[in-house]
A protein has these predicted regions:
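Class II aminoacyl-tRNA synthetase catalytic cores and aaRS-like
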Residues: 2-183
Length: 183
């Protein structure tokens, strides 16, 4: 498609007319995108999904927990670093699967993710839980945690933490059943 002096809105207007019928006719999904297409600013996409091109089929989001872990003894949470979390409710992943997923995220994003689970009593267990024991109530309330939740955590400079959280969100969304709309 070629357009002279087109604005972003001009391009969207044309594509919103052209693409839905094509998606409906040739797409492999029963649900076609409808106009107007959802528009997400770069800042919102990075803060909410950890990516400037998020997979919106995944229902997981990225949450900021920088203020919640301020003053923690865990070195990656040191002052100046941004800390992001991806909460997965009712996650029954085994330790081996979690370790593999974290290794895959580290290879793809270049930064190591951390994790902990919420046990049946509401306490944190596994991964970095021992560094968060004094802030359990605050973190539980702020992130809306319930027993059975898995929390993937990333830390680093803002863009690195966001990027790693985005990769973690995508990997968790595809690995944990019920969080990716395949339709």
């Amino acid at each position: 498609m070629e357009m002279a002096f087109a604005t972003q809105d001009d391009v969207f207007a044309v594509l919103e007319d052209v693409l839905p019928p094509i998606f409906a006719k040739y797409g492999k999904y029963n649900i076609a995108s409808e106009a107007p297409f959802r528009r997400i600013s770069y800042r919102d996409a990075m803060e909410t999904y950890g990516s400037d091109k998020p997979d919106l089929r995944i229902d997981l989001t990225v949450q900021d927990m920088t203020a919640l872990v301020a003053g923690s003894e865990f070195a990656p949470f040191a002052a100046g670093n941004t800390v992001k979390a991806v909460v997965v409710p009712d996650c029954a992943m085994a330790r081996k699967a979690i370790d593999k997923l974290c290794a895959d995220v580290e290879v793809q994003a270049g930064s190591k993710p951390y994790w902990f689970k919420v046990d049946e009593q509401g306490s944190f267990a596994g991964g970095i839980a021992k560094f968060l024991t004094d802030k359990t109530a605050e973190i539980t309330a702020a992130l809306g945690l319930k027993p059975g939740c898995f929390v993937g955590v990333t830390a680093g400079k803002k863009t690195a933490a966001q990027k790693t959280a985005g990769v973690l969100r995508t990997k968790l969304g595809t690995a944990v059943p019920g969080h990716m709309d395949a339709e």
